[in-house]
């Protein structure tokens, strides 16, 4: 029997971030995975980031997590999505070389102090007096710890479907995790089934690249990580093609052979990453669906056809793929498949990602009903931090939907639950003007420094950057001009006699620090590394001031906790229906109570009144 502070089960994106975060806080951590050489494997698409997802990667990085640095080390086609739109909704993304990503992640994991990696199959969880305290391995080994983090991905009772063929697996060639699913049911947790899918892998040497379009990388790649100075990998194009009427006919004629449409699959798939069968059934009026042909590596001929995930039989896959321009002679290296797996209802979780019914147990990733590497990594970081905090007797750290996309995601999951795999979008955040990808470090790194999860190198670099930023902002706010003075330098200002600072003027369309230098030569002293941040903050300053009151109100409601044992039955004036709904949902604070269907402002006032009464009674007893 071996003792640790924290045990992390699963070596995928959530598990790596959880183990790293726990170890960075100083907890003796062990990462248990089926195979060490699969740590960092990208099971589905070879890409990191995107709309909403890129924000999560930046936030992971701001807390000194791994994904951003690893993506920078492996990225082979960087693109900033929504570049023409406002900074709040821009999404950094890169295609990644699978081999480079895996190698970079394994290097990171192997270099972390306080972290051990063990191969094996965690079969059961150990408990004492209702508290999780370790894991039992299939081979008989026992590991004990103050906290356990489960990051099982699609391995929890995983089942692959290719046509009518079923293969128990967590992914191709790897056995599922069966014992832990039974353990969670034994604990009384509410489990469900979800489904995801992946397309066939193609031999790039058999693609007619002259018949497909091309999409290139950005000329100046923007890294994910604050710690990355430059992208060094060669950047490549990907191909672009479309399905045809012939493609659609083959799929429609064989839809009964799809595992998803034959009744073979119980689980619900991701709405925003539909299979090609779903696209044909739901959007049959379209004459074609776009496909991105994404090379899987700089020295790898494998191509990932993004947009045609499927669970049709192999012969049907071969037939419909060959109707796509450029793929007429293509060779399939691995068929596409759907995979079904167990997940836990995320409403079973605290905001710390700890399980309410089983203290000491934390869950992260697809086990919580999410989809995507980025969502998994962000949850892993939160679960790992809070598991480590528990192990050293510190209070958990909660992320707010007012300070991060991480907070938005966790609040959505724990308060609303899921009916399909959850994916992050910028539209999920009410305060997205504040929660931009470009300001993730300013928002979260100070909290990470306080927590102790940010290393010295990042802290020093961040503090130097912040000093430059604050010096530059002070300078911009100290320089001012009248409308008539500005007019002499070509500035179009309202002729109202009011002085405006350089910072104010930057909020005007088409203004920049460079354009203001003829008027104020001292602006040349502002370091290039903070110019864009200052320009964006100036552009959003008025809107941020308006949001500040709303954000303060939400934070106040989030900080008003509702005890787990709060008795809604004693509240006079609350309908029986609302009493039942609130007792079922068990909102953790007033902000979550407001989201319960049917809850009115009057009901919130009533709850708040009773909470205050309980506080006064407790104070009288204590006094």
UniProtKB/Swiss-Prot annotation:
GO terms for cellular component: cytosol. GO terms for biological process: tRNA methylation; tRNA wobble uridine modification. Keywords: Cytoplasm, FAD, Flavoprotein, NAD, tRNA processing. Its main location: cytoplasm. It is found in: Cytoplasm. InterPro entries: FAD/NAD-bd_sf (IPR036188), GIDA_C_N (IPR049312), MnmG (IPR004416), MnmG-rel (IPR002218), MnmG-rel_CS (IPR020595), MnmG_C (IPR026904), MnmG_C_subdom (IPR047001), MnmG_C_subdom_sf (IPR044920). Homodimer. Heterotetramer of two MnmE and two MnmG subunits. Its cofactor is FAD. The gene is mnmG. The keyword Ubl conjugation does not apply. This is tRNA uridine 5-carboxymethylaminomethyl modification enzyme MnmG. Gene3D superfamilies: FAD/NAD(P)-binding domain, GidA associated domain, C-terminal subdomain. NAD(+) binds at residues 269-283. The keyword NAD applies. HAMAP family: MnmG_GidA. One of its GO terms (molecular function) is flavin adenine dinucleotide binding. Belongs to the MnmG family. FAD binds at residues 10-15. NAD-binding protein involved in the addition of a carboxymethylaminomethyl (cmnm) group at the wobble position (U34) of certain tRNAs, forming tRNA-cmnm(5)s(2)U34. It holds the Pfam family SAM_GIDA_C.
């Amino acid at each position: 029997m071996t003792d640790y502070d924290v045990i992390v089960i699963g070596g995928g994106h959530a598990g790596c971030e959880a183990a790293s975060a726990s170890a960075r806080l100083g907890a003796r951590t062990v990462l248990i995975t089926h195979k060490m050489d699969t740590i960092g494997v990208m099971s589905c698409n070879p890409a990191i980031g995107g709309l909403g997802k890129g924000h999560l990667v930046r936030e992971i990085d701001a807390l000194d997590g791994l994904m951003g640095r690893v993506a920078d080390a492996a990225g082979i086609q960087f693109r900033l999505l929504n570049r023409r739109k406002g900074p709040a909704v821009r999404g950094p993304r890169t295609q990644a070389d699978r081999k480079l990503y895996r190698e970079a992640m394994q290097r990171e994991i192997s270099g972390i102090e306080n972290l051990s990696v063990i191969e094996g199959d965690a079969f059961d969880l150990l408990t004492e007096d209702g508290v999780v305290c370790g894991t039992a391995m299939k081979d008989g080994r026992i590991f004990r710890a103050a906290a356990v983090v489960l990051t099982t991905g699609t391995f929890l009772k995983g089942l692959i479907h290719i046509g009518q063929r079923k293969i128990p697996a967590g992914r191709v060639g790897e056995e599922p995790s069966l014992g832990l699913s039974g353990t969670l049911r034994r604990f009384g947790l509410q489990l469900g089934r979800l489904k995801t899918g992946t397309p066939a892998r193609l031999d790039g040497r058999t693609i007619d690249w002259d018949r497909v379009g091309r999409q290139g990388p950005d000329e100046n790649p923007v890294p994910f990580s604050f710690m990355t100075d430059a992208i060094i990998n060669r950047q490549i194009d990907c191909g672009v093609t479309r399905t045809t009427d012939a493609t659609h006919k083959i799929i429609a004629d064989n839809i009964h052979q799809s595992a998803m449409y034959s009744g073979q699959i119980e689980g619900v798939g991701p709405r925003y990453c539909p299979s090609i069968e779903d696209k044909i059934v739901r959007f049959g009026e379209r004459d074609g669906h776009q496909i991105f042909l994404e090379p899987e590596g700089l020295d790898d001929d494998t191509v990932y056809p993004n947009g045609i995930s499927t669970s049709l039989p192999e012969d049907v896959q071969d037939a419909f793929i060959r109707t796509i321009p450029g793929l007429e002679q293509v060779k399939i290296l691995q068929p596409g498949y759907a995979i079904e797996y167990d997940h836990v209802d995320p409403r079973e979780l605290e905001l710390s990602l700890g399980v309410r019914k089983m203290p000491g147990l934390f869950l992260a990733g697809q086990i919580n009903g999410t989809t995507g590497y980025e969502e998994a990594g962000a949850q892993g970081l939160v679960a790992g931090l809070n598991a480590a905090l528990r192990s050293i007797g510190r209070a958990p750290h909660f992320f707010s939907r007012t300070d991060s996309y991480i907070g938005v995601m966790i609040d959505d999951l724990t308060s609303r639950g899921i009916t399909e795999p959850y994916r992050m979008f910028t539209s999920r955040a009410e305060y997205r003007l504040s929660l931009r990808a470009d300001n993730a470090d300013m928002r979260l790194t100070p909290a990470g420094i306080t927590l102790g999860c940010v290393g010295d190198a990042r802290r020093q670099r961040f503090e130097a950057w912040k000093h430059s930023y604050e010096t530059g902002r002070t300078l911009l706010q100290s320089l001012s001009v009248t409308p008539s003075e500005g007019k002499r330098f070509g500035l179009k200002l309202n002729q109202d006699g009011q002085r405006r600072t350089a910072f104010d003027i930057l909020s005007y369309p088409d203004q920049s620090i460079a354009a203001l230098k003829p008027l104020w030569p001292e602006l040349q002293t502002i370091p290039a590394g903070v110019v864009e941040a200052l320009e964006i903050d100036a552009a959003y300053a008025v809107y941020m001031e308006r949001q500040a009151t709303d954000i303060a109100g939400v934070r106040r409601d989030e900080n008003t906790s509702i005890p787990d044992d709060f008795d809604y039955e004693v509240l006079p004036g609350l309908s029986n229906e609302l009493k039942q709904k609130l007792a079922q949902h068990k909102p953790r604070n007033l902000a979550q109570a407001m989201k319960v269907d049917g809850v009115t402002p009057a009901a919130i006032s009533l709850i708040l009144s009773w909470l205050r009464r309980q506080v006064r009674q407790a104070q009288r007893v204590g006094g």
